[in-house]
């Protein structure tokens, strides 16, 4: 199985929370990908952090070990889903989530996210949540 990691999963990994590192090892990092939108969100988070240098360095190290998927191949699907959801009167509020979701669909990847409700309205999406909160 191949996975697209949502930004929140990457943040949990970088912070050493919820044993995401163990799950990644179990699933195989070679089977995991991220969207370039996730890179954008991680960079914003690092820039907005208290220790920018440390945060950017952690992101740099993480990015060296994972394949980044561009959004270009998912733009048509993005437009289709955005129009479909708008016509249903249920617009996707977060454009970045929509782009990440359709990237998973178009690349036939399982989306790994803690925010399952943000994506479950997308046609054809497969979702897993690796986070167990106690």
Name these PLM-found stretches.
Residues 39, 52, 56, 75-78, ...:
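A general structural signal for well-ordered alpha-helical segments in protein cores
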Residues 9-10, 38, 74, 117-118:
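Alpha-helix capping/helix-boundary segments
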Residues 67-114:
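Active-site neighborhoods of divalent-metal-dependent phosphate/nucleic-acid chemistry enzymes
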Residues 1, 101, 105-134:
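Acidic, PIN/NYN-like endoribonuclease modules and their adjacent C-terminal/linker elements
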Residues 1-34, 44-60, 87, 134:
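Short, well-structured N-terminal submotif of metal-dependent ribonuclease cores
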Residues 6-7, 42, 78, 104, ...:
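Generic structural signal for small/hydrophobic residues in well-ordered secondary structure
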């Amino acid at each position: 199985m191949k996975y697209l990691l949502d930004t929140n999963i990457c943040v949990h990994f970088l912070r050493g929370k919820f044993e995401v590192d163990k799950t990644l090892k179990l699933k195989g990092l070679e089977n995991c990908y991220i969207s370039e939108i996730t890179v954008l969100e991680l960079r914003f988070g690092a820039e907005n952090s208290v220790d920018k240098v440390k945060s950017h360095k952690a992101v740099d190290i993480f990015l060296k070990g994972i394949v980044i998927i561009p959004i270009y191949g998912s733009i048509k699907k993005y437009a289709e889903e955005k129009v479909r959801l708008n016509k249903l009167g249920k617009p996707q509020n977060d454009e970045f989530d929509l782009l990440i979701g359709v990237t998973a669909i178009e690349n036939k990847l399982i989306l790994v996210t803690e925010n399952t409700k943000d994506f479950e309205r997308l046609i054809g999406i497969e979702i897993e949540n690796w986070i167990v909160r106690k």
